[in-house]
């Protein structure tokens, strides 16, 4: 059978087929309605189907703003208030924003993601963080094991979610 690509809105469009596998890479940190997306994934998968998910950087990590706030220092987007960031951004740009989410960032924390995954209908078959070949990744992985630093030194998530067979 040939592969066919279609552009569809996951939450608005209807799908006439179910899937065995869903793959998503570097999108969840931009997705504003993740619980609904996870529910839709669940509905679209066949029993036993899997969602392979990888994404980052997470918002509270050193570059979690993806540079979109135009702040030059690591974690400054977490340190400064949203009000200050928006005011500074709007002063420098013709396309004005009212909230950080207008820059295409969900602002979900690592804690938020863990909660959304655990509260979803899925079984979590695999869950790992801070996957990188970069030397700083190893240091961040160590620092993320310290409880109060976990949120700020966890920069990506890779997981496999499985739809339970009924």
Predicted segments with their positions:
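Conserved SAM-binding loop
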Residues: 1-64, 158-163
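Flexible, glycine-/basic-rich loop-and-beta segments that form/coincide
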Residues: 166
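S-adenosyl-L-methionine-dependent methyltransferase catalytic module, highlighting the catalytic core
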Residues: 35-36, 40, 50-162
């Amino acid at each position: 059978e040939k592969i066919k690509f279609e552009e569809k809105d996951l939450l608005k469009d209807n799908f006439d087929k179910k899937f065995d596998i869903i793959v998503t890479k570097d999108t969840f940190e931009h997705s504003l309605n993740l619980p609904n997306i996870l529910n839709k994934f669940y509905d679209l998968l066949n029993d036993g189907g899997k969602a392979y998910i990888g994404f980052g950087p997470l918002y509270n990590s050193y570059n979690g703003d993806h540079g979109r706030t135009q702040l030059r220092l690591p974690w400054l987007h977490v340190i400064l208030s949203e009000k200050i960031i928006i005011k500074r951004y709007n002063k420098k740009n013709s396309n004005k924003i009212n909230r950080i989410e207008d820059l295409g960032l969900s602002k979900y924390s690592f804690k938020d993601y863990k909660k959304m995954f655990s509260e979803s209908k899925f079984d979590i078959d695999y869950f790992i963080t801070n996957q990188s070949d970069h030397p700083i990744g190893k240091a961040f992985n160590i620092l993320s094991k310290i409880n109060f630093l976990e949120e700020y030194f966890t920069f990506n998530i890779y997981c496999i979610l499985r739809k339970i067979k009924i």
